[in-house]
């Protein structure tokens, strides 16, 4: 495997490279054959919205001059929409952090199969979170994604519960190669960030 280099993209660069990001998305998330175009278009629509969110940040990895992985996120809206549908009470300190704009949502972590289990995902998350002033990071993951859940546990994340967003809600989820559909049950995980 070639050496992997990680770099940060500005909002403008992310918008300019959206087609390349979508290519990685399609390759990383092996969906139903024949649905690639629809999945790609849905991703591009959501990505265009996410790039405009407050606190958007993104890192990309490449190996041998080719894309290997992408990760991005943003500060969660203060309205608490992220937590709706959670099957447990949101801890008061998490609510306080959300209202004060101190929660970073890891929206996507896409690692191509050839680069999985090599530490790339760990490095991507670490680099992405370096510049945020948030006190907490959270994400949603498909509970059947054993590799993703295992990575979260090894990184010291805590599961808050399962959530089913309203059918109309578009809530990003991380899959490390296994996508989650809109309205699907996801597990909500979080981790405190040290200053």
Q: What is each PLM-predicted segment?
A:
Residues 2, 66-70, 104, 184:
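Glycine-rich phosphate/pyrophosphate-binding loop shared by adenosine-nucleotide-utilizing enzymes
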Residues 122-123, 136, 143-171, 179-181:
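Conserved active-site alpha-helix within GNAT-family acetyltransferase domains
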Residues 104, 130-143:
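Conserved GNAT acetyl-CoA-binding A-motif
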Residues 1-19, 23, 27:
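Conserved N-terminal entry element of GNAT/NAT acetyltransferase domains
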Residues 22-38:
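Helix-loop element at the rim of GNAT/NAT acetyltransferase active sites that forms part
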Residues 35-64, 68, 72-75, 95:
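Active-site rim helix/loop that mediates acceptor-substrate recognition in acyltransferases
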Residues 71-108, 167-171:
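Conserved acyl-donor/pantetheine-binding loop and adjacent beta-alpha core of acyl/acetyltransferases
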